[in-house]
């Protein structure tokens, strides 16, 4: 089953391809596709503020580049009126300016608050393919046209494409309520790293995304 058909009940009707926002090495500067202004305005302001905070840390570049890709879910009223799922990856443009890269897609209004069964499998598959696409964009120095070709291949063309989804590790996933966001290191495992935030992560929570969680002790 293709990603498009398996997730048809999960994603908004117009969401055949994910939208994206940010920087990749194959692009000379910032770019975006298929994300509404209501999402982009909130997202850009959030990242600009957070990256400014990171730059106050002397060792931030090394730790930033080693940060994981995060899978996220946004409740309504976080980045516009709608709910979203996506992935966020530390990245850099073609001239060495650091800025994260995100793929996101709007959730259908009928999606239940707790994902189970086929709905959960569709979300896990979407996150896996979005992560794969982000890594191909980063490692392949892809420009916007070639990156969209990757999305077309993964999300539309390859009905038999495989992914690294480890189905069965988690039986359900509660989506965040309105005004909150959920951040997952690996959404396919039951006890993976996760963070729940009011709105988008700020201050110490933003640092945790890109510099790592503080060690307890």
Segments predicted by a language model, with ranges:
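N-terminal ordered "arm"
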Residues: 12-67
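Long protein-protein interaction modules used by eukaryotic assembly/scaffold proteins
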Residues: 2-30, 34, 77-217
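Short, structured protein-protein interaction patches enriched in aromatics and acidic/basic residues
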Residues: 54-91
């Amino acid at each position: 089953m293709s990603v498009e058909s398996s997730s048809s009940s999960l994603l908004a009707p117009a969401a055949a391809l994910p939208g994206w926002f940010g920087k990749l090495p194959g692009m000379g500067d910032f770019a975006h596709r298929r994300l509404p202004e209501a999402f982009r305005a909130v997202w850009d302001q959030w990242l600009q503020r957070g990256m400014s905070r990171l730059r106050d840390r002397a060792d931030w570049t090394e730790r930033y580049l080693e940060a994981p890709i995060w899978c996220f879910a946004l409740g309504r009223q976080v980045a516009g009126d709608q709910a979203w799922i996506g992935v966020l990856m530390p990245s850099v443009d073609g001239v060495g300016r650091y800025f994260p890269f995100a793929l996101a897609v709007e959730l259908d209004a009928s999606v239940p608050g707790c994902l189970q069964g086929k709905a959960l499998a569709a979300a896990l598959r979407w996150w896996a393919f979005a992560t794969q696409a982000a890594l191909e964009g980063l490692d392949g120095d892809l420009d916007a046209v070639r990156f969209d070709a990757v999305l077309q291949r993964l999300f539309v063309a390859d009905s038999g494409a495989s992914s690294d989804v480890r189905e069965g590790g988690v039986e359900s996933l509660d989506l965040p309520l309105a005004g909150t966001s959920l951040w997952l290191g690996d959404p396919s495992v039951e006890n993976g790293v996760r963070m729940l935030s009011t709105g988008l992560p700020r201050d110490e929570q933003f640092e945790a995304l890109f510099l790592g969680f503080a060690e307890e002790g």
